[in-house]
Amino acid sequence: MNELLRDDIRYLGRILGEVISEQEGHHVFELVERARRTSFDIAKGRAEMDSLVEVFAGIDPEDATPVARAFTHFALLANLAEDLHDAAQREQALNSGEPAPDSTLEATWVKLDDAGVGSGEVAAVIRNALVAPVLTAHPTETRRRTVFDAQKHITALMEERHLLLALPTHARTQSKLDDIERNIRRRITILWQTALIRVARPRIEDEVEVGLRYYKLSLLAEIPRINHDVTVELARRFGGDIPTTAMVRPGSWIGGDHDGNPFVTAETVTYATHRAAETVLKYYVKQLHALEHELSLSDRMNVISDELRVLADAGQNDMPSRVDEPYRRAIHGMRGRMLATTAALIGEEAVEGTWFKTFTPYTDTHEFKRDLDIVDGSLRMSRDDIIADDRLAMLRSALDSFGFNLYSLDLRQNSDGFEDVLTELFATAQTEKNYRGLTEAEKLDLLIRELSTPRPLIPHGDPDYSEATNRELGIFSKAAEAVRKFGPLMVPHCIISMASSVTDILEPMVLLKEFGLIRANGKNPTGSVDVIPLFETIDDLQRGAGILEELWDIDLYRNYLEQRDNVQEVMLGYSDSNKDGGYFAANWALYDAELRLVELCRGRNVKLRLFHGRGGTVGRGGGPSYDAILAQPKGAVRGAVRVTEQGEIISAKYGNPDTARRNLEALVSATLEASLLDDVELPNRERAHQIMGEISELSFRRYSSLVHEDPGFIQYFTQSTPLQEIGSLNIGSRPSSRKQTNTVEDLRAIPWVLSWSQSRVMLPGWFGVGTALREWIGEGEGAAERIAELQELNRCWPFFTSVLDNMAQVMSKAELRLARLYADLIPDREVADRIYETIFGEYFLTKEMFCTITGSQDLLDDNPALARSVRSRFPYLLPLNVIQVEMMRRYRSGDEGTAVPRNIRLTMNGLSTALRNSG
């Protein structure tokens, strides 16, 4: 570990320890220290896990609470220190004169230059460019704004301390260092006395606010900045013919994802859309206010355009002190109009004061953009480019990036849910008594007829629909209302999860038509919403291209696609495919599905846009975004990629401006490189794909033999992980299962992966791979040759390299000695011992196979920074796990007093914070 980083972690840890001793008493501090020292001894091989178990055996739950909080706070502070040093090292690397590191725009520009990429190629990519991080809710990301604020202040103080320590000794004063430490201590004291998590189950509205918090922390500033930087640099390098598209345009599922979540309603759609719009409109007002203050330019000192003079005269600011300051008068009027816009769209209660009431609201973003362009043009006319390129340029970029909607809210529902609603609508309208009972061909005929006619299916008045149907219709109604208010980009996507047929994709189109989001016109419907199938099981991934081919053979749908710029978005489900088939089989099924989709779209002249439903963990498609995008097949990106971001990953990526910039830059860099640079040429592509297919099949068999076929597996999983507690302790707003069944198939992906992460098995990220590789390599004469084949693929094929690297990353965070403690919670010892031994054996076989193929001695040999990070976290992960096991044991024995469930929640949050990608 970097010495400065180690010093910072020790420094913050020392202050935290002193705060704990002061606030909780020396006995609590000693208990924390004893646990920490014991964990270090275990890490160094000087003690066994039992010694830490003894520390907490029989502990009073009330005494366990401050210990769990202590290690959670230490994880928070360690993360803060790591982020600070990552940003500093990145800055140092960029300013060192050495070649810029991968995943930076500087490196991307060099690669494009070296490859001789022309302006025509760039223009074609940028014309359709879209890089969309889509924020989704997550049960472990429940930290309060107070905690974020404290982290922000501590980060700023640590930066100030670094600057001071970098000065020569004679140029800094001890008193200033003491002041900084006093302020850090005060912030940590406030943090210690603040509840880290809320006890009540979070409402959808709470989750919306958590998502919006990241915009205020970083995204409102950093998304416009990176879009501006990319636009300026592309124009400089490739000329003025490059479209000025805002590449990064964010999305959200929070409040619109009602797949299996009964708490998403018409009201949450309204809340999510209105709060998003309110956030961005108030941001514009704030920036206009700052511009009004800054642009004190006098028309006695420079020339202004006629358009600006007209704008200034309409600004309703006749103060004598402003008479010669046209920019201030113009922007005053723009601010008044933006406040009036906020009042008109959100409500007057959202705006302080009444002075804006004499102004006319902006009718749309184009009017606001026209005014901003007038100010920009006037400044440039008078050679004030340096002024125009600052705050005004960022505001113009913000408008291009966010519009009046901030983000695009996706609607998502399970295909069965859409079918249920239509079955009831058709029956009530006496169009078809039993839609669900029709054949696929009969359903198709009926759906096409409905989409061809403007006649509404829902009668006027108050039809007697079921509660579920009314909820669904309410969601669509409020989505349509939001589009009318905030523009078509407010709700531009409708996702069908578990899509497995053509009718699954057409069914929501009928509902969209009912509310005007699609308009019937015979065989030529028009609309503002992309209908997106989500292929998420292994079988559906394999059949996805065939389903789309059938869909595109329907004239009505193909015509709709053409008026949507011929773009077909497809979402790929990393989570459910992994749960269905295991890590390797899912990764190959996804890659193979992309190959088929790319080939199909190329042949049918359709623009493919892929939406990657990745979670934070490798078991849910996680891993470095830059590497993941570059590992896609050629043609799968083409300037556009959408990807889900959730949980601790959102906090880690977008919790402060520096990390937000770094991660947004990685997404943009990878998208440009994947779209414009030649693909890696495999020596024998057909053979490589054959190998992957064979290993995938072997891995699937091994995974299925445990997860789907072993009769004791469900018992092992439900009793050796905190799954039961996730379901019963208000962890997240969404139920943990789609249906009230006791099967892996119906369990949601987040609790599936979160449970294995908490118990430190990380099973979804590796199980089955070791056996598959060993069986494929075989024994005897051909084994060495097959190992050599795999080693060559690892060297030259980003897909295979990424699969192995991500697997190694997640395996490095597993701890099988802890998994044994969780297995001991199972009453049936035969099941506990047998399945634990199966998992234990597969883990070490997988590690052995990884080392054989990569030539490594250990899992993270090629990533020493991550290896050091994982090792440094070990001492505060262990106590959290051991406390969690002890509390789970008591909770399941009937101890439901306040402290026991509270400690389970605390340890879940602490482990998620420390692991940084637990679900």
UniProtKB/Swiss-Prot annotation:
Its cofactor is Mg(2+). The active site is at 138, 579. One of its GO terms (cellular component) is cytosol. Keywords: Carbon dioxide fixation, Lyase, Magnesium. The keyword Translocase does not apply. It comes from the Bacteria. The keyword Lyase applies. It is an enzyme of class 4 (lyase). Gene3D superfamilies: Phosphoenolpyruvate/pyruvate domain. Pfam families: PEPcase. GO terms for molecular function: magnesium ion binding; phosphoenolpyruvate carboxylase activity. It catalyses: oxaloacetate + phosphate = phosphoenolpyruvate + hydrogencarbonate. HAMAP family: PEPcase_type1. NCBIfam families: PRK00009.1 (NF000584). This is Phosphoenolpyruvate carboxylase. The gene is ppc.
